[in-house]
Amino acid sequence: MRVTDFSFELPESLIAHYPMPERSSCRLLSLDGPTGALTHGTFTDLLDKLNPGDLLVFNNTRVIPARLFGRKASGGKIEVLVERMLDDKRILAHIRASKAPKPGAELLLGDDERINATMTARHGALFEVEFNDQRSVLDILNSIGHMPLPPYIDRPDEDADRELYQTVYSEKPGAVAAPTAGLHFDEPLLEKLRAKGVEMAFVTLHVGAGTFQPVRVDTIEDHIMHSEYAEVPQDVVDAVLAAKARGNRVIAVGTTSVRSLESAAQAAKNDLIEPFFDDTQIFIYPGFQYKVVDALVTNFHLPESTLIMLVSAFAGYQHTMNAYKAAVEEKYRFFSYGDAMFITYNPQAINERVGE
């Protein structure tokens, strides 16, 4: 399969730079996986699409203000993007500089350059940085960090992004990108879903900056997926197995929830799914056998991204590309602050040939 098979034309004007004034007021394109049929509506239509007893699985990671600006003590501006927090004093990060810092290099971070840190080691493309400060990494980031808006949102971050680029149920700090499908859920909608009898469970996957890295190979089978930490606790496993047992659906909110659930299923030894607390490099593309997820709520993804490949594996390649074509024609808003899709699983997708 070629990466270019997942390309599509997207006018710049359809990339959303700000979210809708109300979280749940975005548009919703529903794709019936088995038939490819499309329905246009608004996000609150989700209420009618879910049945009592269906299980919604959310990712409760919280975005950290992961972008830092500063300079090397020896001179030269730097930009630091945290990939993950290693402990209370250390981070693993991407560093942009005219000349990469060497181990032992002193860094002065923050708009006033008051935070002192040392680059202690390099791991491939990533740098290990230790803060020389009494405060924890999280406190430092909350104090001097900027929200790490995706590269295609072509504007500086604003104070409002600290809440807007965060789900209302976010709980565990550690992500450098929001699980964006969840941005559309507000408290009134969650309340209505609960009142209808829809069950809810929460996994954690700390989305890394690798999610924005382009696929740099021609053949997708050659792509090496970035690693992210995921948690699927026992209560989620119990909720999934109970939903399946009573004939209800497991609906993943976002591709990160999909990757968490399917990672836990892949690693399971004795059951459909078992608890999972580990890094995952799961790469889902056409031909992948889904084991857990029956339906998916997700945003519109970048051309040639691993995420449009995941959706194609779920709904079928042709159905997915047709839906994206329709979304462009109907001027849906794309990417993190854009509109959403509701997709049901196509069991025939696994047999489909791509790019022929």
From Swiss-Prot:
It is an enzyme of class 2 (transferase). It holds the Pfam family Queuosine_synth. GO terms for molecular function: S-adenosylmethionine:tRNA ribosyltransferase-isomerase activity. Its main location: cytoplasm. InterPro entries: QueA, QueA_dom1, QueA_dom2, QueA_sf. It comes from the Bacteria. It catalyses: 7-aminomethyl-7-carbaguanosine(34) in tRNA + S-adenosyl-L-methionine = epoxyqueuosine(34) in tRNA + adenine + L-methionine + 2 H(+). It is found in: Cytoplasm. This is S-adenosylmethionine:tRNA ribosyltransferase-isomerase. It comes from Escherichia coli O127:H6 (strain E2348/69 / EPEC). The gene is queA.
